A protein has these predicted regions:
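Charged docking surfaces used in two-component/phosphorelay signaling
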Residues: 205-285
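N-terminal Rossmann-like NAD(P) cofactor-binding subdomain of oxidoreductases
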Residues: 3-4, 10-223, 255, 283-284
Length: 285
């Protein structure tokens, strides 16, 4: 049975550890920093096997190792299973889709270009799991942290109806800045938080950089990161939203105020969070 003939549902993806055969995965935007991170994280993964790497036309036809060259930014070497894969043209959607069960998307394009190409992949009946922000506010695209809002996957049948697909869909992750505090705030919902003030201290990897690329960041900070504050204030409300009439409606609160600072750290974001609750919270709780 070919990858295209397999009918793999969300439930099956969650239960893939029970499958005897790994899912065949493609990485879109594989030569960029986020694509590299996907490849490093998926090395020897028990559920997934990277079989396809796709990037811009200038990398097409090269081995992955040749295409990346000295731009490999991970601390571990390029995985042996990936370095000799031939890079495909990410714009040749049908050709790439025919080789995989689903794709992780990390393409570096404009917002509208990302929206268009991810929908093209979904319309080939290829599920798209995206690291990009382009579809985070598309009403029928689930933006999910599984520990917070797995029920948002229920919007996928409505998305499929819009796209005209049976298997293809798009799902996205939220901005990296909120993943440190949104899960904790979710756990505290019973105490009815109504106001949140957060300051995030974000590593340079969030900008796709290393200290080799960005030496001026050593011993330096940038007190404002364009676009990050809005994402940090609004995206948690979408995670806590409800599905109504086939779309995700964001929650009305709590009110979140955020300041985002770039700091001279290679990897890992930190958040200092102040929360006001309507209900009294004890130290033990």
């Amino acid at each position: 049975m070919s990858a295209r003939e397999k009918q793999i549902s969300i439930k099956e993806i969650y239960e893939v550890n029970k499958m005897e055969q790994k899912l065949k995965v493609g990485i879109l935007g594989a030569t960029g920093m986020v694509g590299q991170r996907f490849i490093a994280l998926l090395e020897n993964h028990p559920w997934f096997e990277v079989v396809t790497v796709a990037a811009s036309p200038r990398s097409e036809g090269k081995t992955y190792q040749e295409a990346v060259g000295e731009r490999w930014k991970m601390t571990t070497p390029i995985p042996e299973a990936v370095k000799n894969l031939i890079v495909m043209n990410v714009n040749e959607v049908e050709k790439v889709a025919a080789t995989v069960d689903f794709v992780f998307s990390a393409v570096d394009m404009t917002k509208e270009e990302i929206k268009a190409i991810e929908e093209r992949y979904a319309k080939t009946e290829t599920p798209v799991v995206s690291n990009n922000s382009a579809h985070r506010w598309t009403p029928d695209v689930p933006m999910v942290v599984p520990e917070i809002n797995p029920e948002h996957f229920d919007v996928i049948p409505f998305q499929r109806e819009r796209l005209g697909t049976k298997r293809g869909f798009i799902a996205v992750k939220p901005n990296c800045s909120i993943q440190s505090y949104a899960p904790v705030l979710t756990a505290w919902k019973e105490f009815e938080p109504y106001e949140v003030v957060a300051t995030t201290y974000q590593a340079i990897s969030g900008a796709g950089k290393t200290f080799k690329d960005w030496p001026e960041m050593e011993g330096n900070i940038i007190p404002y990161i364009g676009g990050e504050e809005e994402k940090s204030e609004q995206e948690p409300l979408r995670l806590w939203g409800k599905m109504e009439d086939g779309i995700i409606q964001k929650a009305m609160g709590p009110k979140i105020t955020c300041q985002c600072i770039r700091v001279p750290v290679l990897d890992g974001h930190t958040a200092a969070v102040f929360v006001k609750f309507k209900k009294t919270v004890t130290k033990a709780q």
